[in-house]
């Protein structure tokens, strides 16, 4: 084997992108079809079984604001390392906060 570090999208995410046994199975349709309004606060909680519109795992657990909609996904603005970021995230990976 070659001692070379992997550089893929899902590297170092064994715990972050895995579910506990009781949470496994099909994703509920209500989670996929959630609706959000502009200026809603949302948390990015990646759903590992739904790959469409998945943000990079470095943003897992962060809170942002919905700015708009792009197709089936939402534009979420958040601050990361002192910079404003605009992520395009599917609603399966979002949870409303407060």
Curated annotation (Swiss-Prot):
Record family assignment: Belongs to the eukaryotic ribosomal protein eL21 family.
GO (cellular component) term, any one: ribosome
UniProt-listed InterPro entries: Ribosomal_eL21, Ribosomal_eL21_arc, Ribosomal_eL21_CS, Ribosomal_eL21_sf, Translation_prot_SH3-like_sf
Keyword hit for Ribonucleoprotein: yes
Bilayer-spanning residue ranges: none
The keyword Ribonucleoprotein appears for this protein: yes
Keywords associated with the record: Ribonucleoprotein, Ribosomal protein
GO biological process entries: translation
Source organism (scientific name): Nanoarchaeum equitans (strain Kin4-M)
Region: Disordered, residue numbers: 1-23
Molecular function via GO: structural constituent of ribosome
SS bonds (residue pairs): none
Basic residues composition bias: residue spans: 7-23
UniProt cross-references to PANTHER family, sorted A to Z: 60S RIBOSOMAL PROTEIN L21
NCBIfam families xrefs: PRK04306.1
Gene responsible for this protein: rpl21e
Xref: Pfam families: Ribosomal_L21e
Designated name of the protein: Large ribosomal subunit protein eL21
